[in-house]
């Protein structure tokens, strides 16, 4: 009888102590404490999450309008699977975006709303959120910043979302090189903060059958990941020059940290989806390019990648004259 009572007393004491401590902190410290508990190295601990939410709600109560607190509350609610409150706090954060101290924070809010729209199959909302990210957090030079900084395509003037030159280079038949090789030899994309937006746009455009846009955004995402890996390799070997994806993959594998970083990305999933969209694009005129891209995955992806088997199946179906699925 004494032990349950003692545990209850201790728990109550901790709660009272916590509430008294909360009262002493200014709102910005409450926000930071809540954020630290959410992203704690201990991982998901329900008690920590409850305390974090208390901190954040108190910070919001004190400041009144606090989009950062709304965002972190949305993260907390996503961790317990409460999509309704997650979305509500994200919408509130977006509504009060003008009060954000760090304007780039808006990108996280928009991307989270796009992910919820994906779950709800609201494709138009998803595309709108992602395009707003591109509109606010990228500029035209992000897409041209290699050989074609000066010599831009005429039809892209004043329209940074026209990235058709990525598609043209990928589909171009050049002897002795793959589509991805040729594209990466022409372009770099180092606005790493929006690679995920391009990746998600590629995914939704493929889902609705907009294959040209699916390929294009997928290529930007793939080139962005390769650009980052190229930067890492160049740190160790300043004179290194990219020749083709096969030799570059071998070079990446020479450095454990770069290899681990590369394998933590969704690169091979992106490339697989590029190939899939290519197969269906323009009434199947580029099936051979799709198959070549799947062959790259079979040859270069790490052995644990599920996209090796998927690519083999697609290649086999193509050779047998079956429809790709």
Language-model regions: role of each:
Residues 248, 255-280, 284-325:
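Terminal, low-structured helical/coil segments at or just beyond the last alpha-helical repeat
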Residues 28, 68, 101, 108, ...:
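Start-of-helix register in tetratricopeptide repeats
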Residues 72, 105-108, 112, 145-149, ...:
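Canonical tetratricopeptide repeat
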Residues 17-55, 61-62, 68:
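N-terminal leader/linker segments that initiate helical-solenoid repeat arrays
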